[in-house]
Each structure stands twice: as structure tokens, then as C-alpha cells.
């Protein structure tokens, strides 16, 4: 899975952002900057599209790694991005006090939703559109918090697999410190995507590509050499988490007239 023409892809995504913003009547956007590669790529795409009308919002919690904030600030300094830090720690600590039995994952999901609230409040205050940062791998696997990091008005990278994001990041001159570190949702201390999912993005993305783009069945995936455990995990996640990327079903009322 190699990007053959990253320059053309950037132009396509920049055009997408400009067209969608114009259609919705917005000139400014806000991006939640985590210090990871996905939000870094989105911020650079927005900068290419609308320049200084981008604002980056850094929203660390009490368990966010120091490295995450440092890397987000590094990106802002290198590309002169308008930004500010708004800690969600007070919201998180209030949640912990209300729910002392909460597990790290539950707290992490709450923090993702606190960030969504913070982004959308800033969006309303400044008349800015919230731009999403979820990649295709995460969306297909349901690896995100519903109404948390999945909430946005536009998503320029939602059709790009994680391994493609890394390639695009290099083309956009994202700092190596961000590209080379282990991907993490930073939901709790020591968390990493690949550790939690149990497989590397290289392996998962190749399987996802074969299944989604090439339409290979479970039997064909196994015949191609994909590990059985990986195939079963990925197909199960796609099936059980599909609802996360769909609007809630609305009951159709019959016999009204």
C-alpha cells in the first residue's frame, strides 16, 4: 500500500476542504491537536487549504503523556500554527470524583467526549467548523469513541488507511518525532493502538485493503496468507462496530394517514 502520487492527493484533499467549507458558509476551522500523526496531517492539510484561518486546540488530560503535548507544540512552532492549550483535566477529575469505580478505559472514553465538548464549544464561540482526524483503519475497526473523537463536521482523511497517513505525513514534512512514535489514542497511561488491538497497522491495513477494496471473503483472506486470528479479529470488529460510523436508525412510522 504505497501512495503513488502524494502531491495529487494533497491537492485533492485541499480542494475537498475548500469546497466543503464554502458550501457550508464557513471560513475558519478548528482541529484538535493530540501530538499524533493523524491530527498533524489534518492540521497541515487545513493550513494548505485556508492558511491562518486554522486554529489548533490542544486538550491534555491528567494522564496525557508529556510527549504528546510537546509534539503538538513542536508542530505548531514549526509551521507557525495558531493554537492554544485548554486542559480537560478539571472535567476529568470531576468525573473521577463522581465515579471512583471507573476503569481507565471508561475514563479515557469520557475524556474523548470532554474534548468533543470543548471543540464544539470553541466552534460555536468562534464560528469555526470542527475538522475530524479519524483515519479509515480506525473507522472500519470501530477504534474510536462514539460522540468523542469520531465527532466532526468534515473529515479529510477518513478514506486513508493508517499506513497511508504515515506516508502522507512524510510528504507534508511532519516532524520525525511524531511519525516515528507508536500510535496511541492517549486514553490512559502506557496505552498504544497496536498493543490494544494486538496487531501492527501494517498487517491490519493490508487485510483491510484486501477485504474492503478487493472484496476478498474470509476464505480468500486466509488463502492469501493472512493469519487466522487477525482475520477473525478484524472481521468481527468491522461487523460489531459498523454502527459507530452510521447515523442512528430512525423508526419509520406506518399508517399515519
UniProtKB/Swiss-Prot annotation:
MF (Gene Ontology): ATP binding; glutaminase activity; metal ion binding; NAD+ synthase (glutamine-hydrolyzing) activity; NAD+ synthase activity
Pfam families for the chain: NAD_synthase (PF02540)
Keywords: ATP-binding, Ligase, Magnesium, Metal-binding, NAD, Nucleotide-binding
GO cellular component terms, semicolon-separated: cytoplasm
InterPro entries tied to this protein: NAD/GMP_synthase, NAD_synthase, NH(3)-dep_NAD(+)_synth, Rossmann-like_a/b/a_fold
GO biological process, any: NAD biosynthetic process
Ligand binding (ATP): 32-39, 133, 162, 184
Entry annotated with the keyword Chloroplast: no
Binding positions for deamido-NAD(+) per the UniProt entry: 113
Residues binding Mg(2+): 38, 138
Catalyzed reaction equations: deamido-NAD(+) + NH4(+) + ATP = AMP + diphosphate + NAD(+) + H(+)
Subunit structure: Homodimer.
Family, similarity comment: Belongs to the NAD synthetase family.
Described purpose of this protein according to its UniProt entry: Catalyzes the ATP-dependent amidation of deamido-NAD to form NAD. Uses ammonia as a nitrogen source.
NCBIfam families: nadE, PRK13980.1
Protein name as catalogued: NH(3)-dependent NAD(+) synthetase
Native source species: Wolinella succinogenes (strain ATCC 29543 / DSM 1740 / CCUG 13145 / JCM 31913 / LMG 7466 / NCTC 11488 / FDC 602W) (Vibrio succinogenes)
Lineage per the UniProt record: Bacteria, Pseudomonadati, Campylobacterota, Epsilonproteobacteria, Campylobacterales
